[in-house]
């Protein structure tokens, strides 16, 4: 229909202009930043108190924050590449401090700076989807390869970050690795091999440490033990004070540890989701039945047990740290 007093060309021009304005409005609305001042002020005050009384703790929070942010970014990027549609990407938990929406995903920072997450719908075979959410955009709607890649992306990013941190530290130190002078990145393999050796040592020491927790005789002591947040903060502060090289090495150790822990096949860690996806894939290949599904919610009791054990190990490490300094 042509408006009164105009031509067909004017009508098309008007329709294009109106559509362009509508697109701009929608873009501005989707990218609108939401800020909650009260939680922002509360978070800043908490950080200020931490800096005043325990600056090492703030440095640890920063190190862990960067590692977790990159970990979750790995999940996010690969999930999109696999055809999934993430709906949330947040650093921290609790109330939102600042957030904005872009391409159907809400990004932001929350008040408790301990961790982060990417929200994917359809993580279980029977979970309900939001209205209008397509099945092919979900985690369960992706291919097995896509699901495995998405789950493993986070830990892999952490391990790559560790290798890079160790390599840069070695480069800055101007030393050698394995008796070979490191004049460039040609000897990066030595760093990767050293990272793998450190990982294996860490994993094999867990059993020894768990045994030492319940050993009341005091006759033996584990050569390696879990570090409580207190000792982690102390080491982080010392690394920062020592300079870039020590800081990079400690950052690499933390990143490597977080990646390794997430690879353990225990819910709610990434390794458990990877194990479920792999078992479904293998079962469907062997039985030639694409309807085979494993509901990760059946592993909830094991998830509670895992959390209980991790909290227990952390508390025991804290007790040992306090005992070392003469408290308790």
What is each of the regions a protein language model found here?
Residues 37-85, 221-250, 325-328:
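Long, highly hydrophobic alpha-helical transmembrane signal-anchor segments
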Residues 88-91, 104, 291-307:
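Membrane-interface motifs of alpha-helical transmembrane segments
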Residues 59, 69-70, 76, 80-81, ...:
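Internal alpha-helical transmembrane segments
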